[in-house]
């Protein structure tokens, strides 16, 4: 039976506390938590454009506060956020964290975020001492399965590879687990989860299309594409003189742009 949880209006990216009694989420540019039994939501930190979070067994929440940032950490009881990871050369984002058993080591996705796409993605692990090791090139959104496997997304498919959580190393070849899982090309986020008992739940589908074209639509319904390049366009508005189009592009950050119809330029 599904029921709404008060205090979670506008919530995205929900995640449970290790004991299942609290729900973490993002809303209104903030990281928050709320009891599953009800009560007021508690703000834990700022997160203007979040890219995932994980609640560790030692009372720490790892989270990505924005599309272009390393990971941060905050005590689940509240307090100041602190840096958790550092960006390596050639990347501008660490995101989609997953604490390993014990709550000290951490899996995450690293890469280069560009408009509407996460490129050069790879799965990395950081030890309790802060040492980083890159594990799987081309993978995203890792999760640890109690069977001793690292599960991750690659091309909207779920893959699994044997993983030693003590040595923080893969041990063997990856095999496909599920074909066709909903994945965002802009964030790498993939719609699946694994319970502590090993059950896997996912949303069937594939890579979501975020690219759209701007088009003129005549009164007879005929469409004529404009020369503007594809983007994640939203809410286009034509200027009073008919020469420009104001439009939002919702990619790494949602921003307003102007398309000049006479020059075919977007700025």
Predicted feature locations:
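Acidic, proline/glycine-rich low-complexity intrinsically disordered segments
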Residues: 1-267
């Amino acid at each position: 039976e599904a029921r709404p949880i008060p205090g979670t209006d506008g919530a995205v990216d929900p995640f449970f506390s290790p004991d299942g009694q609290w729900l973490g989420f993002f809303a209104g540019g903030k990281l928050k938590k709320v009891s599953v039994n009800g009560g007021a939501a508690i703000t834990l930190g700022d997160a203007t454009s979040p890219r995932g979070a994980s609640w560790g067994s030692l009372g720490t929440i790892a989270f990505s506060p924005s599309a272009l940032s390393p990971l941060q950490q905050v005590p689940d009881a509240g307090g100041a956020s602190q840096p958790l990871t550092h960006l390596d050369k050639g990347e501008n984002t660490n995101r989609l964290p997953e604490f390993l058993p014990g709550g000290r080591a951490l899996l995450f996705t690293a890469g280069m975020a560009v408009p509407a796409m996460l490129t050069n993605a790879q799965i990395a692990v950081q030890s309790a001492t802060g040492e980083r090791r890159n594990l799987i090139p081309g993978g995203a959104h890792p999760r640890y399965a109690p069977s001793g496997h690292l599960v991750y997304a690659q091309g909207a498919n779920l893959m699994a590879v044997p993983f030693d959580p003590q040595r923080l190393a893969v041990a063997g070849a990856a095999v496909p687990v599920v074909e066709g899982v909903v994945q965002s090309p802009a964030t790498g986020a993939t719609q699946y989860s694994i319970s502590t008992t090993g059950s896997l739940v996912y949303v069937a589908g594939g890579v979501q299309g975020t690219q759209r074209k701007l088009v003129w639509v005549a009164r007879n319904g005929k469409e004529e594409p404009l020369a503007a390049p594809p983007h994640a366009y939203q809410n286009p508005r034509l200027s009073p003189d008919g020469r420009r189009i104001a439009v939002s592009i919702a990619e790494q950050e949602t921003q307003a742009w102007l398309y000049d119809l006479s020059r075919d330029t977007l700025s």
